[in-house]
Regions:
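Intrinsically disordered, low-complexity linkers and terminal regions
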Residues: 1-150
Length: 150
């Protein structure tokens, strides 16, 4: 559902942020959590740049295999010039996986896999935005082949 998070969900998100920030993984898993959360909870008050960056991050991670660090670099590239950011139709359902389910997974590999599943679930809900996101990233020369992916 596209309604804002309740206090329990917000608390779970904050706890998951603490987990990913303390993770110590150089791949920077935290970026994927930010992107999934923003896209899943976007609403009328969400700025186009925020949703664009979140969807770009999810596309690069889920479809192209980018690490959180690579997504972070892509966000920096996108932010280098001012522009009008695209607007997206917000799907009613934003993915079946929720942050509380991710946090319920045991810390470590299981939770990291749950984060990946959450990202895939949210990105799948925005499948109609894929062409717009891919074209935007190509415009900025942010493309899988640039990072050793085909």
């Amino acid at each position: 559902m596209s309604t804002g998070p309740d206090a329990s969900e917000q608390g779970a998100y904050q706890e998951l942020q603490c987990y990913t920030l303390a993770h110590g993984d150089p791949a920077f898993l935290h970026q994927h959590v930010l992107d999934a959360w923003v896209a899943q909870h976007a609403g009328a008050a969400t700025k186009p740049i925020g949703l664009t960056f979140a969807l770009a991050g999810l596309y690069l991670h889920v479809d192209c295999g980018f690490s959180g660090r690579q997504v972070q670099r892509a966000h920096m590239t996108l932010g280098q010039r001012k522009r009008a950011w695209p607007t997206f139709v917000l799907p009613v359902e934003r993915g079946a996986v929720r942050v509380r389910q991710v946090l319920a997974a045991p810390p470590g590999a299981a939770r990291d896999r749950a984060i990946a599943a959450w990202c895939g679930s949210v990105w799948g809900a925005f499948h109609d935005s894929r062409t717009t996101i891919a074209a935007l990233l190509q415009e900025y020369d942010i493309w899988p082949s640039r990072n050793g992916r085909s």
